[in-house]
């Protein structure tokens, strides 16, 4: 992994090294030394022979500090001042709504808030400063790694979606799981993000399919649902999609 989870553990444990700490070498040294001691203890419990050295990490941070320090600033004040001056600010979030640590498909989530509310927190501004929220959604569904994907396509169709859509991890090249369009997920995302507009991408990927299975609801333990249940309500049960096939022939005819 890339250490994202452990970094958040340190943050919420109030023991992480922040970029601003690089201005104070004595504070950085204290935090790094304590962190290395914890890491080595955990490695030992796992039976690993490898260990970390504080001096190595401190040397690396010392070399990075001159390059990073000029960019330290109060992001919230910068954004707020820009808005007060009549400027426009675009906040771009990462990852999908269902990876949100609070509102996603827990425990198959990331460590941060990936919904629109997290943009205000991350930028250091109040939620009323955000006047429009644009949601970006593909014309089909993808997921990286484990976790629920109710509309996951069968192998040949999944591979077709993956190849046509270029669904491979940007960093690792890891193939993404692919499925059909899921309006239940989109509806949920609209609600938890407070979307004011929606942009649907990669419609052309579906051109080669004669029919498209579209999810119209879920079945969970025999009960028909028209919305995405939370993890507690699902209780570990498997969501089964109810699907209708849509013929694309008529959709390809452009009215004159």
Where are the predicted features?
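Non-transmembrane, aqueous-exposed alpha-helical and coiled segments at domain scale
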Residues: 1-256
